[in-house]
Amino acid sequence: MARGSNKADKIAALISAFRTSGNLDRAFDNRAAEALSVNLTDLHCLNIVENRGGVTAGALAAEAGLTTGAVTGVVDRLERAGYARRVPDPADRRRVRIEVTDHFYASADEIWRPVAADWKTELARRFSGDQLDLIAAFLDATNELTRRHLERISPPR
């Protein structure tokens, strides 16, 4: 990434690198979805469920920006593929939570473990702890700004 000498040039270079990262992330997700034989929406929902350690259908719908009816279809497909299951919510047995399965973890591990290993090795080699803190703060800030603009474009359902 070329870096200019003034702050505006540096911000422009960061935005360019961030956009490239987003494009690569989408390309990787496309390939991962294909490898798992799911569509991108289903993969997105799997990532939400896995990252949150299980969610209700309503919470998944809200975070994914889908209707509860659409989430029912997603979860049905993920159950058929063996990647997710519905379980009673321990806090309220009238509700159902969606969790990922061991089959999903095994399948996902083949895709993401090598990536995670490279990230850990290369980032530790290239950056100091303080630099990693700064990068994490940058990503937190961009995530916050992006969430704000997601709501501006289309309020959560």
List PLM regions with ranges:
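N-terminal leader segment of winged-helix/HTH proteins
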Residues: 1-36, 81
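C-terminal regulatory/oligomerization modules of transcriptional regulators
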Residues: 1-5, 130-157
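Residues at secondary-structure transition points
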Residues: 5, 9-12, 36, 40, ...
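Alpha-helical linker/hinge and terminal dimerization helices associated
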Residues: 18-28, 64, 107, 111-123, ...
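N-terminal helix-turn-helix DNA-binding core of bacterial DNA-binding proteins
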Residues: 28-67
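Canonical helix-turn-helix DNA-binding module
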Residues: 53-96
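Charged, amphipathic alpha-helical coiled-coil/dimerization segments
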Residues: 79-133
